[in-house]
Amino acid sequence: FTFVAIMGLTNASNAFMENVYFEVGTSAVGVEADGNHNDAQSQVTTGAVGKTAVTGSYGLGYMLGSGTLGLDLGYMVTPGEAKIRSTSDSASGKDVSLEISDMTEMYVAPMLNMTDDASLYLKYGWNSTDLTTVGDVNKINSMDGNTVAIGTVMSWGSNLYIRTEVGMTEYDKLTFTGLGNTNGVPTTEKVTATPDVHYGRISIGYKF
């Protein structure tokens, strides 16, 4: 139904091709992290946690091509931050916190022009997220991953367009190990996690 409604707004002739663009969007996001915890007694616990959120983003890019095929090259920023806090199982109960902020993505998306005003695309992206680790564990400064997605771009007038997209980002495995400092987290404690993000996004863009 969304597809049909958006198609009704289009009235330009392949106007989104061969243009630099700027866009802003909002996403419904679901985050899942599978991992395990190896405590000071060498007991291993496995599990998964999940959370949902609504985020905003903005980006710049360039669409090029003509006829049936095209290509979209872009860079997107998702500002904001989130903090995770954990308490060690050691006798000290030392707190460890992890702050995630400012996700960026570079992407390439081959496009198939279905009509004069609408394109379908497949996207592959390279993601990086800043991390700030506080506590007696090894410090990891970034979290990297890759995105695969499918979406549509619908021309709306002569300069505007609407983008809809669904996809997932799989991040590299994170491993945190205690440093064993005084009143800190023992070196025998270790946590690993592999975060995955699933999302749906709608954006409005302007073509220069």
Per-region residue spans from a language model:
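Gram-negative bacterial Sec-dependent N-terminal signal peptides
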Residues: 1-14
